Curated annotation (Swiss-Prot):
GO terms for biological process: aerobic electron transport chain; aerobic respiration; anaerobic respiration; tricarboxylic acid cycle. Inhibited by oxaloacetate. It comes from the Bacteria. Belongs to the FAD-dependent oxidoreductase 2 family. FRD/SDH subfamily. One of its GO terms (cellular component) is respiratory chain complex II (succinate dehydrogenase). The keyword Cell membrane applies. PANTHER family: SUCCINATE DEHYDROGENASE 2 FLAVOPROTEIN SUBUNIT, SUCCINATE DEHYDROGENASE [UBIQUINONE] FLAVOPROTEIN SUBUNIT, MITOCHONDRIAL. Its cofactor is FAD. InterPro entries: FAD-dep_OxRdtase_2_FAD-bd, FAD/NAD-bd_sf, FRD_SDH_FAD_BS, Fum_R/Succ_DH_flav-like_C_sf, Fum_Rdtase/Succ_DH_flav-like_C, SdhA/FrdA/AprA, Succ_DH/fumarate_Rdtase_cat_sf, Succ_DH_flav_su_fwd. Flavinylated by SdhE, about 5% flavinylation occurs in the absence of SdhE. This is Succinate dehydrogenase flavoprotein subunit. It comes from Escherichia coli (strain K12). Part of an enzyme complex containing four subunits: a flavoprotein, an iron-sulfur, cytochrome b-556, and a hydrophobic anchor protein. The complex forms trimers. Can be cross-linked to SdhE. The modification N6-acetyllysine is found at residue 267.
Length: 588
């Protein structure tokens, strides 16, 4: 069957912060850009980012990008690439002021400058006292960012395809990515989007876990598309568990609460973080705080509740006025999902899957990388990745709060700037044969033809339970090996799952089944990677290997999809403008 073809200079898949920032840059340069999103752009998951954008503006105290870089490298447990971290921290202020000029409604200090709040893992002067570096728009910073970028994309005539679901990348015989096939959810029409550059900006995949702060759309579509196209994924064992998800609901409670002066309590009313991180206390790195809460619970000091043991986040001492001006969204979320009024009593919280530090390895310019036989980096022609799906890697083994929005804006912009030049240089569109395009429809055809078999909902539930039980905050070799075997069985079950709804118009079950394929690819890569790394570093914490092992593991892990095997990739320790930060013991 010959598909209808739409041609563009670039196609961006995903309309969150990174995708919209990249699309904006491409459209501003006069190139044609298609922006595909399976939801309306302002409903992308960036909208849930609450706390702010960490950037060294120096509005509340003297600050400097090198201090920010030090904190980020330390936060990453030293497997963040220092050239990329340097680029992000150095260009951050410029990228944020551009947003301000686009009309992003930041909260303000009395003198009119952008308000900045303290966040976890921030310090002055390379590990000195607590810094306030996170620029915020109340506790709705992601919401403000998305609306600003959406309006700018409309103004600059980006062609937006809302409620289109990308099926798979189209690769030609030369191994170049030449666009993607996508399904219009409203009509069921399938179109081949042919492009000189394809940018994956599909976001995270927290839905591989049972309990997550992520939206239902975070299904790892980009990870699945990359793996099926033979592109490796990096550091997939590194999943951040946010210390404060509402117990029982998984809804995020921003770190900004602790930045404003909130703190955690156990069932004895003790402020327990003082024991685990005597200096930073409740504003230690997220992996440290999440583990501390889990240890309190394991040792019997968790608070009891209908959702099981949890910790309490105390905010009432801040007063109604501060909460209403600085954290209005949190008041609303707590009242709705925890049935608690934070003005009067603490919020029940538990560590909840939040962020994927791993993803497609890329250069600072967003160009996707693979490795050749000699283990050298090679660019995948025509493919780019930005945002949470990319592993540049500025976050390493643990992301600092507020750095994700910075990552979106800085690297979305960087990919767009690179594409302005590279698209012009490339000349004619690369071609794909009809069989190349057909190959990208294999999954869709499989689901459309599977009328008998198991209910996919049961398979998804089994996958999420397996991940939650075996690959959570604390991990252990035997449990992870067992988890991997379970996933192999679940993967076989998935091949024989059925699609009940055969309609073409607004068939949400078909989309959910296609998403389940991507969840499976993501979960499997995570499990293999987690079994591979025999140490504890950042978010990857093992009972059987409790120590960090720099001699063997100061490196990225790389999952190779063709062989389903693992290899190592070295960390970049060569920033351009200053000496590298050598690995040290990480204390807060």
């Amino acid at each position: 069957m010959k598909l209808p073809v739409r041609e563009f200079d670039a196609v961006v898949i995903g309309a969150g912060g990174a995708g919209m920032r990249a699309a904006l840059q491409i459209s501003q340069s006069g190139q044609t850009c298609a922006l595909l999103s399976k939801v309306f752009p302002t409903r992308s998951h960036t909208v849930s980012a609450q706390g702010g954008i960490t950037v060294a503006l120096g509005n509340t105290h003297e600050d400097n990008w090198e201090w920010h870089m030090y904190d980020t490298v330390k936060g990453s447990d030293y497997i963040g690439d220092q050239d990329a971290i340097e680029y992000m921290c150095k260009t951050g202020p410029e990228a944020i002021l551009e947003l301000e000029h686009m009309g992003l409604p930041f909260s303000r200090l009395d003198d009119g400058r952008i308000y900045q709040r303290p966040f976890g893992g921030q310090s002055k002067n390379f590990g000195g006292e607590q810094a306030a570096r996170t620029a915020a728009a109340a506790d709705r910073t992601g919401h403000a960012l998305l609306h600003t970028l959406y309006q700018q994309n409309l103004k600059n005539h980006t062609t937006i395809f809302s409620e289109w679901y990308a099926l798979d990348l189209v690769k030609n015989q030369d191994g170049a990515v030449v666009g993607c096939t996508a399904l219009c959810i409203e009509t069921g029409e399938v179109v081949y989007f042919k492009a000189r550059a394809t940018v994956l900006a599909t976001g995270g995949a927290g839905r591989i876990y049972q309990s997550t702060t992520n939206a239902h759309i975070n299904t790892g579509d980009g990870v699945g598309m990359a793996i099926r196209a033979g592109v490796p994924v990096q550091d997939m064992e590194m999943w951040q568990f946010h210390p404060t998800g509402i117990a029982g609901a998984g809804v995020l409670v921003t770190e900004g609460c602790r930045g404003e002066g909130g703190y955690l309590l156990n069932k004895h009313g003790e402020r327990f973080m003082e024991r685990y991180a005597p200096n930073a206390k409740d504003l230690a790195g997220r992996d440290v705080v999440a583990r501390s809460i889990m240890i309190e619970i394991r040792e019997g000091r968790g608070c009891d509740g209908p959702w099981g043991p949890h910790a309490k986040l105390k905010l009432d001492h801040l007063g109604k006025e501060v909460l209403e001006s600085r954290l209005p969204g949190i008041l609303e979320l707590s009242r709705t999902f925890a049935h608690v009024d934070p003005v009067k009593e603490p919020i029940p919280v538990i560590p909840t899957c939040h962020y994927m530090m791993g993803g497609i390895p890329t250069k600072v310019t967003g160009q996707a990388l693979t490795v050749n036989e000699k283990g050298e980096d090679v660019v995948v022609p025509g493919l780019f990745a930005v945002g949470e799906i990319a592993c540049v890697s500025v976050h390493g083994a643990n992301r600092l709060g507020g750095n994700s929005l910075l990552d979106l804006v800085v690297f979305g912009r960087a990919a767009g700037l690179h594409l302005q030049e590279s698209i012009a240089e490339q000349g004619a569109l690369r071609d794909a044969s009809e069989s190349d395009v057909e190959a990208s429809l294999d999954r869709l055809n499989r689901w459309n033809n599977n009328r008998n078999g198991e209910d996919p909902v049961a398979i998804r539930k089994a996958l999420q339970e397996c991940m939650q039980h075996n690959f959570s905050v604390f991990r252990e070799g035997d449990a992870m090996a067992k988890g991997l075997e379970q996933l192999k069985v679940i993967r076989e079950r998935l091949k024989n799952a059925r699609l009940d709804d055969t309609s073409s118009e607004f068939n949400t079950q078909r989309v959910e089944c296609l998403e389940l394929d991507n969840l499976m690819e993501t979960a499997y890569a995570t499990a293999v990677s987690a079994n591979f790394r025999t140490e504890s570093r950042g978010a990857h914490s093992r009972f059987d290997f409790p120590d960090r092992d720099d001699e063997n593991w100061l490196c990225h892990s790389l999952y190779l999809p063709e062989s389903e095997s693992m290899t190592r990739r070295s960390v970049n320790m060569e920033p351009k403008l200053r000496p590298a930060f050598p690995p040290k013991i990480r204390t807060y």
